[in-house]
């Protein structure tokens, strides 16, 4: 492969992966409206060998340095040649919208004025196993919550020092004063009105739900990475808001399509509260 094609391949690969993520996020948002479960949809379409399972997880949007940078770089390069990459423009627009999803869900649940409310946020880095905060969805969520008047307690297994540095640049002094950097996941929950999960760290996948419930003022979880099964969370007494897991309102609405006899949903692994 020649050098120019090799360089193009690197950018094209990241653009393709970003496109898969944004498409799944669009489908997840529609699934919430119609009462479908995007996790079931993911498994279904991923079983098609033409598609595969990689990068089909819906969530709170992508971040980091590579995907955003490479998508924009390809679009800018196309512009210099008088071309417009419409799909990649849409991929970026969808991702920017998706990074605001958790904030919209929280504001939709509690109203636009969050003065006097306190939220716990688990996960600050843009993905697990790094402290990289570049274009991390958590930064968007924190700005939304703080500018609506809330206070927050944040925790990340690795990114706390980098988060402190980054948020000092992101936030106004009065906003930063309403951020507490917690020492542990449960420490972040103390007195919170709800928990928001933004990064899919392994440490968050199998928590002690009894302790979570005891620490929160109300058992409410906004899960931006679909770590848990809605049916199991309901059995444990949590109000659970995932991404594309199908709202109760939509599920209760009549469908024009014939429906199979109802069957009790189970978690993806017997006895497990977490996804595969």
Language-model-derived ranges and their functions:
Residues 1-276:
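Structural/interface elements that position substrates and couple domains in central-metabolism enzymes
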